[in-house]
Design a protein with these regions (language model features):
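Short, aromatic/His-centered strand-loop micro-motif at the edge of beta-sheets
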Residues: 147-176
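Short tryptophan-centered beta-strand motifs in secreted/extracellular beta-sheet-rich domains
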Residues: 104, 173-181, 186-188
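Ligand-recognition surfaces built from glycine- and aromatic
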Residues: 28-32, 99-101, 114-115, 200-232
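Bacterial N-terminal signal peptides
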Residues: 9-19
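Secretory/extracellular carbohydrate-interaction modules
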Residues: 65-146
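Solvent-exposed N-terminal domain segments of exported/luminal and surface proteins
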Residues: 26-87
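Bacterial N-terminal signal peptides that target proteins for export
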Residues: 1-11
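Sec/Tat signal peptide C-region and signal peptidase I cleavage site
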Residues: 21-25
Length: 232
């Protein structure tokens, strides 16, 4: 009787490789509508197309908040400024009689000396596109939130301004800021409560909104974080 032959059978294990897509790091423009903005950085450097842009000065954090970071000792201010900035500039210029608004939810931390950083501005510009004074700056100073509002249209660097306390002891908490222009009047609300209302019929310049990190210091580091930023 013939003995059946034994044929060894070997199972070959198949190793499968799957291409796993690498997560692409998010940038501010993936969360915030920045199509109408440009940014000014130390250098000075200007980035006009913010789609897909981020840097050490301007980025999105893990909470998907828009962050502005700056060492105030860096060099490279804009021609008319004493301090460097990481700051957005809205591209639309408008007149005082128009209906305009900026809404922001923002907080700031700093080791600046002096401890003062501007987070929102209405800046002036002349009809022939030359720089004019800022009409309004909303700034954190040693943990308190202030509005600094021009009281004349004098085209001078240190023209008179009114300093208005908006929130005492804010510290590093988030705050909601509404800046509204309507019928020649400026209204500022903090966390939904109206704090300022002024007639600005005296103001002769065109204007535009700014938002970001603009320290009034040359020493220390500042970080400004926006959860929300919209204009109309």
């Amino acid at each position: 009787m013939q003995t059946p032959s034994v044929i060894p059978f070997v199972m070959l294990g198949a190793v499968l490789f799957f291409a796993v897509p690498v997560a692409r790091a998010e940038v501010p423009s993936s969360v915030f509508d920045l199509r109408g903005w440009k940014i000014t950085l130390p250098g000075p450097k200007e980035i006009k197309d913010l789609e897909g842009y981020s840097s050490d000065y301007f980025f999105l954090n893990a909470q998907r908040e828009m962050c502005f970071h700056l060492d105030a000792s860096e060099k490279g201010t804009t021609p008319s400024a004493k301090y460097v900035r990481s700051e957005l500039r809205h591209l639309t210029n408008w007149r005082i009689g128009e209906s305009r608004a900026l809404t922001a939810e923002v907080r700031a931390t700093s080791s600046l000396d002096p401890d003062k950083v501007t987070v929102v501005q209405i800046h002036g510009i002349t009809e022939d596109k030359k720089d004019a004074p800022p009409l309004l700056r909303v700034a954190l100073q040693s943990g308190d939130l202030y509005a600094l509002l021009k009281t004349t249209s004098l085209h001078e660097k240190n023209s008179p301004e009114e300093k208005i306390l908006l929130r005492e002891g804010l510290g590093t908490d988030f705050v909601n800021i509404d800046v509204v222009m309507e019928g020649g009047e400026l209204m500022i609300a903090i966390d939904g409560e109206e704090k300022v209302r002024r007639d600005l019929g005296f103001w002769k310049f065109l204007n535009y909104f700014k938002a970001g990190c603009y320290p009034q210091a040359t020493e220390g580091v500042a970080d400004v974080v926006f959860r929300r930023l919209t204009v109309r």
